[in-house]
Amino acid sequence: MAYTFTEKKRLRKSFASRTNTLPVPFLLATQLESYRAFLQEGRSRDERLNEGLQAAFTSIFPIESHSKNARLEYVSYQLGEPVFDIKECQQRGLTYCAPLRAKVRLVIMDKEASKPTIKEVKEQEVYMGEIPLMTPTGSFVINGTERVIVSQLHRSPGVFFEHDRGKTHSSGKLLFSARVIPYRGSWLDFEFDAKDILFFRVDRRRKMPVTILLKALGYTPESILDAFFNKDTFYINTLGIQFELVPERLRGEIARFDICGKDDKVIVAKDKRITAKHIRELDAAGVKKWAVPGEFVVGRVLAHDVVDKDTGELVARANDEITEELLKKLAAAGIDKFQTLYTNDLDHGAFISQTLRTDDTTDEYAAKVAIYRMMRPGEPPTEDAVNALFVNLFFSDERYDLSAVGRMKFNRRIGRDELTGTGTLSTEDIVAVIKILVELRNGRGEIDDIDHLGNRRVRSVGELAENQFRAGLVRVERAVRERLSQAESDNLMPHDLINAKPVSAAIKEFFGSSQLSQFMDQTNPLSEITHKRRVSALGPGGLTRERAGFEVRDVHPTHYGRVCPIETPEGPNIGLINSLALFARTNWYGFIETPYRKVVDNKVTDEIEYLSAIEESKYVIAQANAELDAKGKFKDDLVSCRFKNEFTLSAPDRIEYMDVAPAQIVSVAASLIPFLEHDDANRALMGSNMQRQAVPCLRPEKPFVGTGIERTAAVDSGTVVIAHRGGRVDYVDAGRIVIRVHDEEARAGEVGVDIYSLIKYTRSNQNTNINQRPLVKVGDVIARGDVIADGASTDMGELALGQNMLVAFMPWNGYNFEDSILINEKVVAEDRYTSIHIEELSVVARDTKLGPEEITRDISNLAERQLARLDESGIIAIGAEVEAGDVLVGKVTPKGETQLTPEEKLLRAIFGEKASDVKDTSLKVPSGMSGVVIDVQVFTREGIERDKRAQSIIDTQLAEYKKDLTDRMRIVEDDTFARLEKLLHLKVVNGGPKKLAKGSKISKEYLDSLNRHDWFDIRLADDEASRQVESLKDSLTQKRVEFDAMFEEKKQKLTAGDELPPGVQKMVKVYLAVKRRLQPGDKMAGRHGNKGVVSKIVPVEDMPFMADGRPVDIVLNPLGVPSRMNIGQILETHLGWASKGLGEKIGQMMAAQTKSVVKELRHFFKEVYNQSGKAEDIDNFTDDEILELGQNLQKGVPFASPVFDGATEEEIRRMLALAGLPEGGQVTLYDGRTGEAFDRQVTVGYKHVLKLHHLVDDKMHARSTGPYSLVTQQPLGGKAQFGGQRFGEMEVWALEAYGASYVLQEMLTVKSDDVNGRTKVYENIVKGDHKIEAGMPESFNVLVKEIRSLGIDIDLERY
């Protein structure tokens, strides 16, 4: 069993009873693959598939002019290189993007030629705007901030049949409807009303009888009836009227007269119901026709037009009802045969026939006119416009597209075998939909479930971007078509025709402000992954919160293994925003698939197949926890399975597939909760959501009890640094790791060195700290894919969101009432929950009307202490500790000339001009903030001279880059000279430095005596060897030139002016690191939805302690467990205690330092790791590795209890016993204040507890005086506005109830909106006279004005 570099250092004991057949796939694959398919970068023009950008271009081009004399054709496109890398874009506030250029061809036809002849062709590359590029971690950098495009779950194109569940009509009758939804174009609805007449509507406009649409499609009334009805045939002869018998149609009917056989024997008596027996008898008797009375025919409906053969006169029309007069007419006209529609009340309704009666259009054109009037009311219908509109509705490629998915779903639903076809609708398609709808109304067939994941598909980034790009191109197309007519006469080139602005505007708008383009949640690595794996039903073309009903939000059986049933927000978005399940992926059509193991001949194989929700319902699928024997066959006679979205028990021989893993049904966040199977679903939901809010701690600590997904989550999130290639570590410091690559992994002619620059103290989107720490030391040998540096919230390559705390479940003086949390002061002293938050403060110097603003140190009225910290450029020094109100960047703004007061005149006389014509607009630290300045960045517009600070920042960056290049050059040189030495050793020479004699052999001593660069001057006798020496020399020189060019390019980039917004001359960004310690009011939570607020931090000596004197870290209320039903936290606590106990045991073994310590450790590890669950290959570890493992496990042996396959009670007891702890998990605690034992034993153990991003420091806020609202003159609200506390209606009631009239008066006047009163109070306080004179509150004046505006005169009279 191969272990990675970090796994070997700290093995996690897994209790999984079954091995995963399929490793967890790369978690960000959906985003990355979708965008890769959109760009199709790196593919040649001929290899590109018709998707993404390619599809957008080919769907719009070629563009023809109105006269057809010129056309613009698309050839290919290519993406350029981005100007700035990701980090530079973030610093400068730019978008990380690449220029897109399309090669187009302008073809001009010869007008004079009789047949189409090409006159000239011009080909050219045209700039089409910038396309944002995706970072390797699946996000986008837009205007300097990281954003994520969330995938959208929308209704798949195709045809859907449903009914109104009896809600529309008071009778509760089911009204059936069908809807054809295209990917792009008009929606077509068909619906029955309460009178069983079938209507259609386009784009939810006015409804019209469906026969109008059929007539517009070219059907006559006769052909309509022919398409939808079976016929009964009647003959008129001398015997009267005879009826051609179709026995099957008579079942269930009541005979209106005696039905006799050939021998006049009565088979069915009058008024009796005809049964299957009667039908068999009729068949046997060979009755084909029988005579019927006239009333049997009356009331039936004619199926076709009836024409008098002699005169050619129309006797009756199709769909006319037969009356006695009409029968006489038919007989008189010599009609000997006619057909009627076969209908009955049970399963052959006369719906189309009734609809045809309500329709008064006469022919195809009249029907089209009716549709035109419905679509464009008030416009005069001309023949061309009428025909064009009808064709454009559903039959034009430009206006209508079902898409490949829509066509596949459509054909599948209407029962066709082929799944491909055109994107537009055909007459047959529309008729097929109407037929199915009529069948549904007749009681045959099933309606569709719109919440089934086979009817909802995912639109990922690539597809959403493609739609926007196409929308931009459509705007371009209109402009190009206008200009094409001039192309010939004005001799224009393609770039004159195409204006790329609409395209870039559409793309920019989508990435910048679309509802699905969201500011990335970057609190910790898990929140990043979850955000990128999110699927939302909201957004353009999706649902809205208000309209979404309960059914859409509910968990559906098809969510199994596709969408997580647990992780979704609480509140208005519940069920509309979901997370992809752990193993889910989207297929080519956009439907979510989940993997299954194939079962062949009762044996579960390791062959994996992905099934979508549509395919899955056909198979019987066993769950992952089904018991298998050694051969992979099912042990039980009945196995719990799923079939047709129902849970059922099935015999093993019927099973066709089996789940891949027990964790298959949940998302990443839910799969990180150990013992999830013991938690109530509501609490599991809160647990999944709160893990995403955990703030990275200063020293991350791996969870003692995890699930085994921690490593996958950390690696896939991109927060840890992964080795791209194997090699040996050459150099390590806090900021970079240099690795000399193994020869077999280095490509020819390439530098065999990888340099990883680590991210140091960088601000995330949520102001948390991202910092990477190296895990390797010089000389370590690492393989490809190993974790070489930890990031935020990771510990040795594993996700570590919180800290392991010693927890006791007991009440403590009411301080843990209602979920409050009691914390040991030691936790704060040891900085266990201290986190660093980085605030970015920026200031810009603009060019104003009165002159440019200036960033300077020369500011009047600034205290010496403040000035001392600013450098000569007026910018604060890095490392300075600052508090609220301190100046960070000095800035002055020119001030307009104003009338000077005598005092100002005096100041001007003393200090000269400068003092009065500028005002101080320096960047100061906002209220309530303090910290340390950790970085400063200065951006200067092109053409404006840089100050010394800006220059020194550039110099530092260049020096760092030079250091990187020098390292790479050093390794290249070492590598080259090592090869050269091997080549020269013991070779015969013709001569060389230090008078080397011809014919002598080169010794190692001789080479050591020379400078390495002089080795190239040795002249070898062997020509081939000489050529190799020359080749090495050339490649070394080439590398040096290459590196010099790279340095120059970097220098050029840094020294060039920065792109800044218009009018901005200079911008300075200052980064503050703020240390936040744990304090009362901070919110904390476990992973099981158990959240609370810190109520008190108790001195160590007062905390309850164990018999060995160890005080507990946290005291939680035991009443928080039973009603919430999240028992997982108790099991975690027990197993966490075992983990710590085993760690201490290992520590004791290591401390004993006996000779046999390695042997003892190896034996103990086998006890821990190999008695149950997944076995580990302990024998494969070397003695040094065993010792290092022991060293790392002293704090605690990490356990993995995978979801739905976790540790059993027996296994937890066994681990507690192995650690020498009580198996019950309870122990006697002593009161820290009295030293007495508590009455009964208390559950104690270790639990992973998180500090959440709801910190009291961010919420606490106080105001003295501040801004007021303009209209009401009341203080603004909220911390951001530096607002006041609202004294609302209920608070007023409270004071009224107390009778505190003076307090109430000042609350409603001088402390709020009595403008004069509050100024007076301020003056009085200054004078030392503490009087209050309350006046009229401004809001009363507003009320008076409101009443006057209603036309009611209101005046105040003084008494």
Swiss-Prot record:
UniProt keywords, alphabetically: DNA-directed RNA polymerase, Nucleotidyltransferase, Transcription, Transferase
Gene Ontology terms describing biological process: DNA-templated transcription
Family annotation (SUPFAM superfamilies): beta and beta-prime subunits of DNA dependent RNA-polymerase
Entries under NCBIfam families matching the protein: PRK00405.1, rpoB
GO molecular function, one term: ribonucleoside binding
Taxonomic superkingdom: Bacteria
Family statement drawn from the similarity comment of this UniProt entry: Belongs to the RNA polymerase beta chain family.
Self-association state and partner proteins as the record states: The RNAP catalytic core consists of 2 alpha, 1 beta, 1 beta' and 1 omega subunit. When a sigma factor is associated with the core the holoenzyme is formed, which can initiate transcription.
Protein name as catalogued: DNA-directed RNA polymerase subunit beta
Enzyme Commission code: 2.7.7.6
CDD domains in alphabetical order: RNA_pol_B_RPB2 (cd00653)
Catalytic activity entry: RNA(n) + a ribonucleoside 5'-triphosphate = RNA(n+1) + diphosphate
Signal peptide (UniProt feature, chain positions): none
